[in-house]
Amino acid sequence: MSKKSQDLTETQVSSRNVFDGELLHVYQDKARLPDGKVKVREYITHPGAVVIIPLLDNGELILERQHRYPLHRDFYELPAGKIDQNEDPLSCAKRELLEETGYVADSWRYLATLHPCIGYSNEKLIYYLATGLAFREANLDDGEHLEVFTLPLITALEWVNAGKITDNKSVSGLFWAEKVLNSNW
């Protein structure tokens, strides 16, 4: 970039809360664009979530099968969960791993923060690699039903390629895991 970067900032003119749900909040704002025009911007606020890549000593990953109501089908996923208000993301990751899978980890490594839907949400996903796993006991949240199983990373990646794993957060996490475990990152 040899030229000076253009200011692309959009400035909020007004904001209207359209919907307040238990998890999501929808807003419709008017924003002033860099050229001075005012346009409507609609977006969803989300508290953020953690995604855990739990790696067993034998090299297999812990995954979950869970029904997702919006798409009316089961999905294969990495363990994950919503960050509670004022909760530290690593504390959330530890809590979610234990609640959903029954495992605790001796070692935690931050991998990345990704924004899965930047065009309409402020949601962020914070990824951790969990190793040194030991089983305790799962304690699912009320209304949460899932099946926990293990799978080699190579098989999980084959499932991605075959379209059997399509969940965005899990696909991203599996690709991160492959890079990290192959010492490429």
Model-found features: residue ranges?
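Long hydrophobic alpha-helical segments typical of transmembrane helices together
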Residues: 157-185
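Basic/polar N-terminal segments that are highly enriched at the extreme N-terminus
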Residues: 1-8, 185
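Unchanged
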Residues: 39, 48-51, 56, 82-168
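Acidic, metal-coordinating catalytic segment for phosphate/diphosphate chemistry
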Residues: 10, 14-51, 57
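Hydrophobic residues on conserved beta-strands that form the core of alpha/beta folds
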Residues: 26-28, 40, 64, 78, ...
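A glycine-rich, hydrophobic loop/mini-helix early in the fold
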Residues: 49-73, 77
